[in-house]
Regions:
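ALDH superfamily catalytic-core signature
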Residues: 2-145, 218, 298-312
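Conserved C-terminal structural/oligomerization subdomain of aldehyde/semialdehyde dehydrogenase
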Residues: 58-67, 79-81, 89-100, 135-313
Length: 313
């Protein structure tokens, strides 16, 4: 958003000028923008098995550490039901997964300095070994926390606890929180077990209808919406030039829907047998995507066979 403000207004806007309509522009040409997001993962309360807790932890960590967190849709805030019986177990599983992930290079300019500053902050924990080049950090969000309104753009994950009286109350309160207190509106994820059964469908429909995000992903990382060409990809409509947030306009939308509001992606709560190939915990990912690239270059049968075998063996 800072880059956008400098292009349109010639400088970074002061907080008091955010949202104003009458600010003078140095560049009046309209253009499409996609500017990132403080991506929330909403955890809907239910009874989860130990295996499901670990699986969802791997899913969340994948959404955090893909490209080492240098990603416009990287997971940043895990929104948890306070006093939910599995809350501490899920947080512990996320922290454990962060502790065993391989060390990645913090290659982005000034990211090392940002991480070193974060390491010195109060109540922040490094989950991986202190000798690692890139620390994997976690922290509980405080009231009006800076990182509710700013992308951390690194390997740092935050937890937010929402008080609730019942499931529907949590749905409404979590939606209100991410819509109004979390910066950006590019994409949001909701992890809800048995999302389409009779009992839960009303909750799922409420999430998809009321979350003001360009992509709402049920049981998946919103980034997967980007690789589906029929889905629109961009911020939720209505962002002002002087408060651009996740941007204006959209790409993809292969069906050419006029003025799409959002794309909604549904996935199974847990896939059987093995983790998906894009999970950081899937050890075959590098080989599979390498073979997929070769196959897409020439569509040869030989490379198709190699692709299949790389996924199976």
């Amino acid at each position: 958003d800072i880059t956008y403000e400098n292009i349109v207004y010639g400088s970074t806007l002061a907080e008091k000028d955010k949202g104003k309509k009458t600010l003078p522009k140095v560049n009046k040409k309209p253009f499409t923008t996609e500017l990132g997001n403080v991506t929330p993962f909403i955890i809907h309360p239910a009874t989860w098995s130990s295996g499901e807790i670990k699986y969802q932890a791997r899913k969340i960590v994948t959404a955090k550490l893909n490209n080492n967190g240098f990603n416009c849709i990287a997971a940043q805030v895990v929104v948890l039901p306070k006093d939910w019986k599995h809350a501490s177990k899920l947080v512990s599983a996320i922290k454990k997964q962060l502790s065993i992930e391989k060390d990645r290079l913090a290659y982005y300019p000034k990211s090392t300095e940002t991480l070193n500053t974060l390491k010195k902050a109060k109540h922040i924990t490094q989950e991986n070994d202190l000798s690692c080049a890139t620390p994997h950090l976690t922290k509980d969000l405080e009231l009006n926390d800076y990182f509710e309104q700013n992308e951390v753009w690194s390997s740092t994950l935050f937890f937010k606890y929402i008080e609730y009286s019942d499931e529907l109350d949590f749905v409404e309160k979590s939606i209100n929180y991410v819509n109004n207190q979390v910066w950006g509106n590019l994409g949001a994820a909701v992890l809800i077990k048995r999302h389409n059964n009779k009992k839960n469908k009303i909750y799922t429909d409420t999430y998809t209808a009321k979350l003001n995000y360009g992509t709402v992903a049920i049981n998946e990382w919103p980034a997967l919406g980007f690789i589906i060409p029929t889905m629109p990809w961009g911020g939720f409509p209505g962002n002002k030039d002087s408060d651009i947030q996740s941007g204006q306009g959209y790409v993809h939308n292969a069906y050419f829907f006029e003025s799409p509001l959002k794309g909604v992606l549904y996935s199974k709560f847990k896939l059987p047998f093995v983790d998906p190939v894009w999970f950081t915990s899937n050890k075959k990912g590098t080989k599979v995507f390498k073979r997929l690239t070769y196959y897409q270059i020439d569509n040869s049968k030989l490379n198709l066979i190699k692709l299949i075998f790389s996924a199976l063996i």
